[in-house]
Amino acid sequence: MKKQFRLWLTACSAFFVAGHSVFLSSCNDDLPAASYYTFTGEMMSDYLKSREDFSLFARIVERAGEMDFLASRGGRTLFPPVNAGVEDFLKEYGYASVEDIPEAYCDTLVKACMIDNSIVYTYNLTETSQQKNELDLPLVIQTTGDTVDANGMVLSIVNRRAAIINELKNDSVENGVCHPVSKVLVPSTSL
């Protein structure tokens, strides 16, 4: 009986070791370099970083801690102000530089010019269109034909403050669309 028990125990141990060697061994995934995928698309964060005319707004986005969000997947619409618009904002509100804007207000400024989960192209807009920004405040876009740029093209005005720059509008990126504007969109509840 003892001999049968040892034989049975030895057989079970052998099966146990053999079984675990199958489950505990790892596979070798040495794939050729051509098999790996490298994303090469441009996200909103890349759009801001790669264009010198958005360097001041890109710094506001960095200070707000939102650059990673603009690098993430999704579908959003961004109205980034050009450097001249940011400089006008700094003068208007008494800031010497972007670094003087409180970080919490930087976050507010970024969210004021962003529509998340919605891609809005200007050619889909009616004469007056209203969207909610990230602060849940209205972005009113008026394209009435009353205001034209130097080339005679009709301008779209956002919140009666900033004009969408016609030469740069509807610029698609992997995670949405950018409509550069002439001024910083400040949050407002009275439109």
Each predicted region: which residue ranges?
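Beta-edge loop/turn motif
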Residues: L56-K132, G176-K183
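Sec-dependent bacterial lipoprotein signal peptides
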Residues: M1-S26
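Aromatic/histidine-rich interaction motifs
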Residues: E99-E167, P187, L191
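Second-shell loop/turn segments in exported
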Residues: G41-L48, Y93-E99, E167-L168
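Activation segment
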Residues: L31, F89-L90, S188
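Short, exposed beta-strand-loop hairpins at the edges of beta-sheets
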Residues: E167-N175
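Bacterial Sec-dependent N-terminal signal peptides
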Residues: G19-K49
